[in-house]
From Swiss-Prot:
Transmembrane segments: none
SUPFAM superfamilies attached to this UniProt entry: Cysteine proteinases
Record keywords: Antibiotic biosynthesis, Lyase
The gene coding this protein: rifF
Protein name: Proansamycin X synthase
GO biological process: antibiotic biosynthetic process
Species: Amycolatopsis mediterranei (strain S699)
Pathway the protein contributes to: Antibiotic biosynthesis; rifamycin B biosynthesis
Effect of inactivating the gene: Inactivation of rifF gives a rifamycin B non-producing mutant that still accumulates a series of linear polyketides ranging from the tetra- to a decaketide, also detected in the wild-type.
Amino acid sequence: MNVFDVETYLQRIGCGGETGVDLETLAKLQKSHLMAIPYSSLAYELRDAVNVVDLDEDDVFVTSIAEGQGGACYHLNRLFHRLLTELGYDVTPLAGSTAEGRETFGTDVEHMFNLVTLDGADWLVDVGYPGPTYVEPLAVSPAVQTQYGSQFRLVEQETGYALQRRGAVTRWSVVYTFTTQPRQWSDWKELEDNFRALVGDTTRTDTQETLCGRAFANGQVFLRQRRYLTVENGREQVRTITDDDEFRALVSRVLSGDHG
C-alpha cells in the first residue's frame, strides 16, 4: 500500500494546492516545510534510524510528515525529493559534509540535500540541516545572496564548493562543503555502516543527542544539547540552558513550533 500522498504532504506544510513548477512555488515549499516540520534527532530511536539506503518512505512519511515529528536530513530531504519529483521538478540528490561530520563519521557523504534545475538554472534546496542556513532556494552562483538578514555565498574549491554564511554581525563561516555530483541513495551506505557501528558500540552512552530546530517567519531556532540558538533577521543569540525544566520546555516549543 502506498501511503505517501502529495496532497496530504502539501496540506501538512501549509501549501495545499501549490503544485506549480516555478521558483516562486519552490521557495514557498522550502520555507513552509522548514516552518512546519522540525529537524529532530528525537523523532526516531537511533536503532530505528540506521536504514539510510533502504529507507521505508511510507513509514517515514507517516512519522516525519503526517504526524509532524520531523527527522534527520536523510528523512526530510529524501521525502522532499520525492514530493518535488512527483510535482514535476527536475531534482538531483547531493551529498555534503561538515567538519564535525567528517570527524565523527569519517566520510564526505554525510549530509543529504537536493539540487533543483529550473529553466536551465541550478538551485540548492535543503529542508534538513540542523543549523543556521538558507530557508529558500539558493542559486548555484558566485554572487552573494541575502535571505532574512543572513548572507550566503558559494566558494569554489578544488573538489566542489564551500557553502558559507555570514550573519548580521558575524564573519563568514562554512556551513558545509559539497560537490554537484549526482548521487544515488546507495551512496550513503558508508554513513549507514557508521551508524550501525555506533549503535553496536556497547561502550558508548552518547549515541543519541538532543538536536532539533525549525524556521519561523524571519529566522530559525535550534537546540543542541543545552545550547539554545536563535537567529532573527540575521542576528544570533546563544544561551546555555542549565535548568532542566526550561530545557524540556524549549525542546517541546521547538518541536511544536511554539516559539512564544
